[in-house]
């Protein structure tokens, strides 16, 4: 019988209420081009990373995305988000309690994020590195989410089979990545709705989540 061998956590919007910080920086960046960030463009950016994120942004703003423009925007965004990540970042409801619950049960955990390592470290300052046996960032694998690379690498580092791990995500992009890696999936939407699909279990928040819920997800996933 399949057992729960690991929990793999997304960071932005799942553990930390940090999407608002990204939103602030993106709106400021759009303003520098004399544009206004629309809700549709913002939603399309949630979970995106690297050059693809800036192509989505520039297309949405109606701006030509030359290589030079993308590089300049990326440098500005990293500097601004670094400023905003200084100091404690708010937690998502129930996230800290669930981390404590899983750790107390002795189940290994990994942080699996599309955020660059340099920025993820600021998030880890708030969360606490002691929770995780591994942390994997998008700039440390060939392809970020929605590719499965970050999840496959996290499972490898923990020495677990992806199908015996539960991924906890908040976005469509992250959900696709987790399922492509073969993980059981719990979706707790934050800033943008996540479409229902086979293999996706939804909760409104992490408040009240029990270890048995995660164990059941693995069993159901193994039998699907």
Question: Where are the regions that the model predicts?
Answer:
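Active-site neighborhood of HAD-like aspartate-dependent phosphohydrolases
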Residues: 1-43
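Helix N-cap/coil-helix junction residues
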Residues: 35-37, 63, 129, 159-160
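Metal-dependent phosphoesterase signature
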Residues: 58-97, 105
